[in-house]
Amino acid sequence: MNKRRKFLFASVLAVQNSNFIYPSCQRCFSKIILESKRFTCPKCGSSGDTGSTNYRYKLSLKVAESSKLFFITVFGSCLDTFFGLTATGLHRYLGDSIKNLETLDSGRTQSLLTTAVEKCFVGQSFVFGVTNFGDVCGHDSDSSNFQQPCCKHRGEVRTLVASQIILPSPHVKGFTVIAYLHPLLHKKPHCGSQEHSSQSLTSDDSDSDLNNIQGSGNTSWFSESSVGEDFFRYWEPSLELTSSDSQVTSSDDFPASKQIMASGTPNQNRHCISVSEVTSSKNCHDSLQSLWSLHSCMDKNNTTGKLGEELGLPSPVCNSCHESRLSDSHFFPSQMQEPFEEHNLECYSKAEKNDYSQYDIACYQHHEVNTTPILQQRSSAFSLSSLKPEETANPSQNSDSLIWDDLPLSESLNKFLAVVESEVAVTEIDAKNRKQGMDKSIDKCHKNYSRLSLTPWRNTRALNTSCFSLRSSQAMMKDSGKEALFSNCKSNSSPHIQKESKADKTEAAVSIAGSRSDISEDFLPDTCSSALFTSSKDREAFITQKRTSGVLQQRNEISCRPSTSISDCSDLRSRYFTGCGQKLHSGTKGKLAIQNCSKKYSDASDLHKLENKHRWPKKEDDNFTICRKLTYPLETLCSSPESINTSKEMPYRPSNNNLTPSSSGDHEGSYNASADLFDYIAKDKDIGTEITKIPQDNLLPLEVPCTENYPINENRGQPSQKPSLQSISPSRYSRPRSQSDSECDFEESQDFVPCSQSTPVAGFHQRIHGLNGASKILPSIYSNPNANYKNRKNSPLTGQYQATSACSKNVKAFRQKPESPFVSSLTQANVFNHCPAAESLGNDVDEWVPPTTKKVFISDILGFRVMGLRKCLDLHYSPDPKELPRKKLIKVTHKTNI
């Protein structure tokens, strides 16, 4: 007889039978009679050997749909997915277990099997394909009135037969019966027979059993079985419930699997209670335990409630004696929202709701929100269960079912998005607060700039700071420190920002304070400079950075420059002290320790002398006047006479044309001023010669002493470079960089050499001549600025340096008093590099400026005292009788056609 299948969506409440398999006929699926060696089918009469007996599943369940109860008996191989193996395989497995395990008998084995079946099915929701729905209710199966109650069986529990059981959603997962049964069979027996009853399904047993199932050592038992069947620990993903044409289902012989695959998938099959879905970040054991121990929950909770919108769970079941066809456009009737009256479903739904709302919402509140991973995690952990039938009837919602699958189990979309958006808003507020804090830290650093710029000086003499110096120092602070400070603030290095800003601001403060002509006696005290650095590591990092700008050199400079106006001199003076003031943060009188002098320069190979030659074109007769000047360092006086056989080569480097005040270690550039000051400069370790182009007719007497005594600095060295022998650009020249940590002595000449302003600048050649024809490159010597930082001894009142006995005979330190400045025809930024400081002045580069023929003394303008070179030498030191003879400036004339 052809019957149409009706589908019923219901939840399993209990297991009604204990015998889940029976021997069946392979033709009519009826129960056969087993004899000693053969079997016989009473319905069709077929027979066969007992060894070829086939078994079939039979499972009787008590289910609930809405407020109605049904007894449904499921037959066939559709249960293979949930048991994990076929019925024949299960029969063989039980027989082998009884033989292998002496403690097991048939009664205990059957009891344990019942327990495993209950754990697998109770509390789950399935779609049952019912075959006798119309016969039981007494209505025509073709009737469209599915909501009419059954008058004959009013108040009775109806019994239905199902040949199909389908998971409502492919996302629902669970353990199979065999996965529960195996740990129960191999579990050690306990005293008492109550464990073997069906009441043993408690939370403790469920916890221990599930832990045994999840153990890593429980997978080997499948291979040990002699059944040879394929076992599954988890439910296989079954095909979803699909709608098909009524003509397809008219034949009972048409397989159910083909009926499912006949048409598209409606979204009604997703209206299920995904009880085995992991609903939180808790382990799988906790989630499955709360779902599979439904009977215990039912006994403890006797309250009743509705399953409507409050719990977020659907009730897609029919009233009594109603059915739903596959061919109907509405898979479930409109009265599916009738709430369950069974308290077990209320208990389940409350447990699910509390599990999500208490744990997962707390996770949103305590962790940083990342919207995309959260949605992906929730979509994998939850299946759609709160969708209403009216919503599923909407075609637009059916077309995008995957979006609804991402929704949580017990949370509406609005609530879910509200939680996420609130956390995103909190994150944005935190970002704004961090940005404001960063801005405040930058403002604080700028305030530290201005505070450091007003650092008091040790000397009681008032320092008049010009507006020009103040403006230039402020511009210098903005240009040099703004970008570095902002980048460091973004990298969360506030302490480093403050340290760096302090170091830069110190230069600015010194630059402002050094705008007077008596800057040589107004230095930053040692205590102030030490306070700017919190540790020796900071001083080392700061001084090392400044050391890279150049190396220490000893040189004498002879330059002339005319003065045109007082305003030009003022501008020159402000520029001069702005550049020189950046070298003054280490001490007032400078601290010079010469203890390491004999260590680093005792070798005769380190003593050199330099001879540079430059040519200047003369306008009148095209003659070149070459001024040769030889200078001897202090080392020659402190070492053996054999050290004179080597020559020292000084590095000459090209540099930029602009002189701009800045707080960095390198100061490069040139400026066009009408007046300039030149001096003999006594530097620390090496000697450099500055060659000046002088017309032939203005050459001074050559009896200028060039040998001087120099104080030695222990913290600076000079890397050697071979000078270029090729012609250098006529518009630019380079000079060696200089760097000093303490005060140096000035000695100037009374003579000056005016030059013609209209004389064009021509190329010149540089030749290095060493004594006895030998030349050697001075090796690079670097020293740790912190190593001897504390060894420097300076008298705060006299400003004199304490030298070792190795050099004390020929070295005398005295106050820096420039004598006899003259007007120079060359605009050079490093003419004033004689200023003592702990930082290096910038690159020694300047652009040649056409000279002038005016001869002007600017001693009154700049406030310096004029003192002759010989007078200065007589006052400050007496030459050693063993001192090397001084060489004179040799006048050589060449004629050249320009």
Swiss-Prot record:
Transmembrane segments: none annotated. One of its GO terms (biological process) is cellular response to cytokine stimulus. Keywords: Apoptosis, Cell cycle, Cytoplasm, Growth arrest, Nucleus. InterPro entries: DDIAS, NA-bd_OB-fold, Rep_factor-A_C. Residues 726-741 have a biased composition (Low complexity). Residues 191-210, 643-670, 710-749 are annotated as: Disordered. Residues 643-664, 710-725 have a biased composition (Polar residues). GO terms for cellular component: cytoplasm; nucleus. Induction: Strongly induced by a wide range of stress signals: nitric-oxide, gamma- and UV irradiation, hydrogen peroxide, adriamycin and cytokines and this induction is dependent on p53/TP53. Expression is low in resting cells and increases almost 50-fold as the cells progress through the S phase. It is found in: Cytoplasm; Nucleus. It comes from the Eukaryota. Highly expressed in the testis, spleen and heart. Expressed at high levels in the primary spermatocytes and to a lesser extent in the round spermatids. Also found in the bone marrow, brain, lung, kidney and liver. PANTHER family: DNA DAMAGE-INDUCED APOPTOSIS SUPPRESSOR PROTEIN, DNA DAMAGE-INDUCIBLE APOPTOSIS SUPPRESSOR PROTEIN DDIAS. May be an anti-apoptotic protein involved in DNA repair or cell survival. This is DNA damage-induced apoptosis suppressor protein. The gene is Ddias.
